[in-house]
Amino acid sequence: MKKTTKKTAGGYGGSGSHKLYQRVKKKAGTITASSRRWLERHLNDPYVHQSKVDGYRSRAAYKLIEINQRYKFLKKGQKIIDLGAAPGGWCQVSGCIVGSSDEKPSVVGIDYLHVDPLPGVVMLEMDFLHSDAPQKLIDALGTKPDVVLSDMAAPTTGHRQTDHLRTIYLCEVAADFALSVLKPGGHFLAKAFQGGAENTLLTTLKQNFKTVHHVKPPASRSESVELYLLALEFKAKTERKEQLFLF
């Protein structure tokens, strides 16, 4: 692995400082060009470096931090459900903000991938799309949540529209769950991909929440089609005509 000096442009990487830029050498038959580019980007990502310094399990933690700094929807004393929680970055951030503890956990996460234990977090190792998952989440939390978070995304195929549709489906399922369980005035945050097929989802969110925002935090890579839908202040008294998104 070759290291060269590169000047950063500020942010988490430092303000106008110099850092070592790491290049990955290609050995015949060992790594593709696209994989090498991804690895170089990952190794030189200032958010990746900062996550190690701050003890977060992923750079995604900063996406939630940045969104909350702007909209301040996470507060001390809230109850949180985190869908697609692996490797645990969002659970770490939300748990710290709401003051969750092992004695009185306020955060419940779920993922089919294993997540190592986190202080103040109850983690369910199961697929959220399983029919038993919604009730198990509520049972684990012991009450309705104030906030439902979802950073779920389907494995990418490389085909932009296919990836968008698959991730929007997960967002729809997460939204339906949120509409079913949130406390009055609760909030919903979920990952989506830009692609134009989320009109039904947006209509439903606007009918059931006071405000809905499209958010692309600085920690989301500029070239990524990723964005987040933030729905604030759940209108619990709104009558839902039907369950639009089925598990």
Curated annotation (Swiss-Prot):
Main location group: cytoplasm
Compartment(s): Cytoplasm
Disulfide bonds: none
A Pfam match: FtsJ
Gene Ontology annotations for the cellular component aspect, listed alphabetically: cytoplasm
Keyword Disulfide bond: no
UniProt GO MF annotations: rRNA (uridine-2'-O-)-methyltransferase activity
Enzyme Commission number(s) of this protein: 2.1.1.166
Chemical reaction(s) catalysed: uridine(2552) in 23S rRNA + S-adenosyl-L-methionine = 2'-O-methyluridine(2552) in 23S rRNA + S-adenosyl-L-homocysteine + H(+)
Region of interest called Disordered, as start-end residue ranges on this chain: 1-21
InterPro entries on file: RNA_methyltr_RlmE, RNA_MeTrfase_FtsJ_dom, rRNA-MeTfrase_E, SAM-dependent_MTases_sf
Binding residues annotated for S-adenosyl-L-methionine, in chain numbering: 88, 90, 111, 127, 151
Catalytic residues (UniProt): 191
UniProt entry tagged with the keyword Lipid metabolism: no
Coiled-coil region: none
Domain of life: Bacteria
Entry keywords, A to Z: Cytoplasm, Methyltransferase, rRNA processing, S-adenosyl-L-methionine, Transferase
UniProt cross-references to HAMAP family, sorted A to Z: RNA_methyltr_E
Similarity remark: Belongs to the class I-like SAM-binding methyltransferase superfamily. RNA methyltransferase RlmE family.
Function: Specifically methylates the uridine in position 2552 of 23S rRNA at the 2'-O position of the ribose in the fully assembled 50S ribosomal subunit.
Protein name: Ribosomal RNA large subunit methyltransferase E
Source organism: Bartonella henselae (strain ATCC 49882 / DSM 28221 / CCUG 30454 / Houston 1)
Gene name tied to this protein: rlmE
